[in-house]
Regions:
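An N-terminal, globular interaction/scaffold subdomain
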Residues: 1-119
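Long amphipathic alpha-helical segments with strong coiled-coil/leucine-zipper propensity
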Residues: 89, 93-187
Length: 188
């Protein structure tokens, strides 16, 4: 009787029917603190708690925005295709969806890698174009042109923040040394 139960447990074990995947991704900061505007607001309103920030990379066609949108699209696909598993951000994928899911995720990762390389190659031009756009917007509003290079992350910072880490993990089973059950539980 006990061998039949063991065989049934082997067949119905979640480790035979699903896989765990973990995804983490980085992005770039797209807002900068505007200390000049903060000083004016604090002086006029008398509120020392005010923080004013300005949007970076306002142009929706900017490669940085495209990268962020693609990373968000990948994350949304990952969440919709998998189920939550535990508190460590792992997600469970049914084995029947494995090939479709992994192919789509690999496509996303390849696209993001190409975009990342383009961003890093053209970083100084992307920053300068955005500075010009922000300063033109400020000038059109009659405000001083305060956008500057120091508002943006450096190339080295960008290299560290634009990443995708995606990998499968085994699902723990009764035989896994990291997972133990009391002998009484094994008999149930």
């Amino acid at each position: 009787m006990n061998t039949n139960v063991n065989k049934l447990n082997e067949v119905t074990s979640i480790s035979n029917r699903a896989m765990k995947f973990r995804l983490s991704r980085g992005g770039t900061k797209r807002r900068v603190r505007d200390r000049d505007a903060e000083a004016v607001v604090k002086q006029q309103l008398g509120d020392e708690g005010q923080i004013v920030s300005r949007q970076l990379f306002k142009d929706k066609n900017n490669l940085v925005n495209q990268y962020q949108n693609k990373a968000n699209e990948m994350y949304t696909y990952h969440v919709r295709s998998t189920l939550p598993f535990g508190d460590d951000a792992s997600r469970v994928l049914p084995n029947t969806s494995y090939f479709t899911y992994t192919q789509k995720m690999q496509d996303f990762i390849s696209e993001l890698a190409i975009m990342r390389n383009r961003i890093l190659t053209d970083w100084s031009k992307l920053v300068q174009d955005d500075i010009n756009l922000r300063n033109a917007d400020l000038a059109a509003q009659g405000k001083p042109q305060s956008a500057q290079t120091s508002d943006y992350p450096t190339l080295a910072q960008m290299e560290n923040t634009l990443y995708v880490s995606w990998f499968p993990e085994p699902i723990s089973t009764v035989n896994d040394f990291r997972f133990s059950l009391e002998p009484e539980m094994l008999e149930i």
